[in-house]
Swiss-Prot record:
Its main location: cytoplasm. This is L-seryl-tRNA(Sec) selenium transferase. InterPro entries: PyrdxlP-dep_Trfase, PyrdxlP-dep_Trfase_major, SelA-like, SelA_trans. It comes from Campylobacter jejuni subsp. doylei (strain ATCC BAA-1458 / RM4099 / 269.97). The lineage of its organism: Bacteria, Pseudomonadati, Campylobacterota, Epsilonproteobacteria, Campylobacterales. Converts seryl-tRNA(Sec) to selenocysteinyl-tRNA(Sec) required for selenoprotein biosynthesis. Signal peptide: none annotated. It holds the Pfam family SelA.
Length: 440
């Protein structure tokens, strides 16, 4: 006897009038999913068609809700990895729109009618901005680290300080990336102290490179020391080896002076090592990309690696990166939104908060607070900001606002909106969304 004989037929559910407005493939998928789930957790209770349809509609609504959507970042974390890190300026998007929506010369030389290099679009601008010999772009900085090590150190040894063997988001660890690249890791020093002699004593006939990794997502305080890349580079030159700086983040131009102390500047560092890499969507404020700068001979080896085909970027990334580079070269820093948010004056942030507070139908309090840089950058630094606090259960309020795509935070048991990360062009939308809520 078929124990599922009481279940409505899939076709009957798909053809039900209440699902008529949904595309066939979507409703067919969720009808099958819901029925399979109920069969898995089978009980002898009667399964009604109405109950199944209710569950199917719930699943479909959740599915549509899961689409990528714009949100208002009121968290106070400027480079928020879970919210897409850096934001692209509308004018940069408009400049790229024609390329993205049409065929383009991404790998075609319009001068001679032959195949061209996809990197040509950004190569000259990178060399100009950072004063480096050569450059390359891959899909993120983890890919850059992998490509550099695999191209320059395969089956050889790389030396790294124990204090710099970091773990980045999603449990990706530098030692595991090194291993996956086909390179042997030699750890030197301790978690809090590493000296130049530690590197020197570890060099052997199989050593290819000394790796320095910037501690961008944590801060080491108290009794500690590390060797700067300039001194490491002097050592490798003497020994006939290579130096590589995995910068991760790093800044380029026009960054808030409160943040730049002890934070490496890319243009300076590229002169102090053989090769370095950093993320395009962190402090640089552009799209996700791994940007590699260095000696022409070394970048040439990276370009010959067959893995580059798997790690290359597409026309969207190249288009947006190209426009970001143009903004930097023209010193049009207002178009680099990450820089603008980090540099915004406290009085401007207060003005934004007051404009919203004045229009809200709910009672709020204006307070001073601190914002974070985020994105695994500058963990020991914060920026002054203004917040609005809301009365009520903080967790319930956080959930309620999240349903309206407003991402705030809880601070001192209060739900707050941080106005450093709320852009001026979002203020009216924010007011409208909050005022449409019935009760908080």
């Amino acid at each position: 006897m078929n124990k599922f004989r009481t279940f409505p037929q899939i076709n009957t559910l798909i053809q039900d009038e209440s699902l008529k407005s949904y595309p066939f493939y979507i409703k067919a998928f969720f009808c099958k999913k819901v029925v399979a789930k109920l069969k898995e957790n089978f009980s002898r209770d009667e399964i009604s068609k109405d109950k199944l349809l209710l569950e199917i509609k719930k699943e479909i609504k959740t599915f549509y809700r899961k689409d990528l959507q714009s949100v208002i970042n009121a968290s106070g974390v400027v480079i928020h990895t879970n919210l897409g890190r850096s934001v692209i300026h509308e004018e940069l998007y408009e400049a790229c729109k024609d390329i993205i929506c049409n065929y383009s010369n991404v790998e075609f030389d319009l001068e001679n009618g032959k195949r061209g290099s996809r990197y040509a679009l950004v190569l000259e601008k990178l060399k100009m901005l950072f004063e480096c010999e050569d450059a390359l772009v891959v899909n993120n900085n983890a890919a850059a680290v992998f490509l550099v090590l695999n191209s320059l150190c395969y089956d050889k040894e790389v030396i790294s300080s124990r204090g710099e063997l970091v773990e980045i988001g999603g449990s990706f660890r530098v030692p595991e990336v090194i291993k996956a690249a086909g390179v042997k890791l030699c750890e030197v020093g301790t978690s809090n102290k590493t000296h130049l002699k530690d590197y020197e004593q570890a060099i052997n006939e199989n050593t290819a490179l000394i790796l320095k990794t910037h501690k961008s997502n944590f801060a080491l305080m108290g009794f500690h020391s590390e060797v700067n890349i300039k001194d490491l580079h002097e050592l490798v030159k003497e020994k006939g080896l290579l130096s590589y700086y995995d910068l991760g983040s790093g800044w380029c131009e026009n960054l808030n002076e409160k943040l730049i102390k002890n934070e490496p500047k890319i243009k300076k560092l590229v002169q102090e090592c053989d090769i370095l890499s950093f993320s395009g969507d962190k402090l640089f404020g552009s799209v996700q990309a791994g940007i590699i700068l260095g000696k022409k001979e070394l970048i040439g080896k990276l370009k010959q690696n067959q893995l580059l085909r798997m790690l290359r970027v597409d026309k969207l990334t190249l288009s947006f990166l190209n426009e970001s580079l143009k903004a930097y070269l023209q010193k049009d820093y207002e178009k680099i939104i990450t820089l603008k948010l980090l540099n915004d004056d406290l009085s401007f942030i207060e003005e934004k908060a007051l404009r919203v507070q004045k229009e809200l139908k709910f009672q709020t309090q204006l307070k001073k607070s601190k914002s974070l840089v985020g994105g695994g950058s500058m963990p020991d630094k914060s920026l002054d900001t203004y917040i609005l606090t809301f009365q009520g259960d903080a967790l319930k309020l956080q959930t309620r606002f999240r349903k309206e795509n407003i991402i705030g935070r809880i601070e001192n048991d209060e739900f707050v909106l941080d106005f450093r990360t709320i852009r001026e062009n979002e203020l009216q939308k924010l007011i409208l969304k909050i005022n449409q809520m019935e009760n908080l």
